[in-house]
Amino acid sequence: NRFFYFIGHSIFHPLVKGLFVLLVLTGILGLPEKWALAVDFQTYLKGAQAEVSRHKEIIREDPLDAIAYFELGMAYLALGRHEDEVEAYLEAIKLNHKYTVAHYNLSMAYDLLKDGPNAIKHMLRAQDLYIQKRNHARIRNVKRQLNLLYLKYQDKTKTPKN
C-alpha cells in the first residue's frame, strides 16, 4: 500500500481525466466549451478533495509522516485553501525541520496570503538548505524567488510572525 502512496496516486490523475473529458465533450460530442470546462473543473475539484481526504487518512494512521503533511499542503494548494496549506506545511516542517521543499512551498503559500516577512523567512531557509545540499539548480530558482519577494515586499520585510 505504501508503494502506491509514492507513485500510484496523484492530484494530477484527476486533472488528466478532466482534460480527457474536456476533449470528449467538446471534440466528439460538440458541446459548448464552457459546459465542458465546468465538468472539467468539477472533476478537478473532486480529485483535489479526494487527495485531501486520502492524506488526512494517512496522517491518522501515521501522525509523524512529514511527507503526508506536505502532500496535504499540496492538495490544499490545489483547492485554494492557503491558510490550511500553511498549517500543513508548518506541521511537515515541525516533523522534519530540514524539509527543504516544504520551506519553499510554505514561502510561496505565505506569499499568496500576502505575508511578506514569513515568505522571505522560509525562502531564506530553503536557500540555506539547498546550499547545504549543493543543489545549484534549486539555489538559482530560490534566489530568483527571493529577488521577487524582496521587490514585492520592500517596505514590509520587518519581523515575521512565525
For each feature predicted by the language model, list its residue ranges.
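Conserved structural position within tetratricopeptide repeats
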Residues: 57-61, 90-94, 128
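Register position in tetratricopeptide repeats
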Residues: 78, 112, 145-152
